[in-house]
Regions:
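Extended, alpha-helix-rich binding/interface surfaces that flank or overlap catalytic cores
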Residues: 48
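Glycine-rich loop at the start of a catalytic domain that most often binds anionic cofactors/ligands
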Residues: 51-52
Length: 203
């Protein structure tokens, strides 16, 4: 996978890798995990699975000129159907965002109007960070492959300033813990307090 280093470049290869990673995490979520808490206090595992699929559908709506607010914040599925639901949402996402020209066209989301590639970067964040959320909530490996996580972190630092973030769906950055991996540092940059969810070796 090539390393994307600026928000002006095509971020879709990163999104494809992040979607593949999210799919692997979802595949390993079992029925006994569904009511477990997650780092997103408004979601348990079941509703976070539904929210992850919803982010893809909402991004597809943004890219196609629709209103993402018509899509529920969290989709629903039977406990054994989450991988299939995510597959359908990923397929729908790419039906819209495979259009190269869309990266440079203005699109409108609830938080503003901007070039399409910015909407792709937002989905990259959703996939990697909510993948991290699901992984730590279900006892899976939470760190993405370093090339993916480092590239995504570099892009998001360029695309999303530390401040101001008024009107954006991100909180202020959180100071990373010493030794935090790139995926955790990405979550921190996007406002996630990861400390309660990560066990660290005492020295």
């Amino acid at each position: 996978m090539g390393c994307v280093t600026t928000p002006q470049q095509d971020p879709r290869p990163l999104v494809r890798a992040a979607a593949d990673r999210a799919r692997r995490i979802v595949e390993n979520v079992g029925p006994d995990h569904m009511t477990a808490p997650t780092p997103c206090p408004e979601f348990d595992v079941r509703t976070l699975l539904g929210h992850l699929a919803s982010t893809l559908e909402r991004s597809a709506a943004v890219g196609s000129g629709g209103d993402p607010r018509t899509i529920p914040e969290s989709l629903t599925a039977a406990d054994d159907e989450w991988p299939a639901l995510l597959d359908r949402s990923i397929e729908h996402y790419w039906q819209v965002w495979n259009d190269d020209a869309l990266l440079y066209k203005p699109v409108t989301a609830p938080w503003g109007t901007f070039p399409g590639r910015i909407a792709v970067l937002v989905e990259l964040d959703e996939l990697i960070v909510h993948g991290w959320d699901l992984a730590v909530a279900t006892g899976q490996e939470a760190e993405a492959d370093p090339p993916l996580a480092e590239a995504a972190l570099e892009v998001m630092r360029l695309a999303l300033p530390a401040s101001p973030r008024d009107g954006l769906p991100f909180g202020p950055p959180v100071e990373p813990a010493p030794g935090a991996g790139a995926t955790e540092r990405l979550a921190n940059w996007l406002g996630r307090d990861t400390a309660p969810w990560v066990r660290r070796e005492r020295t």
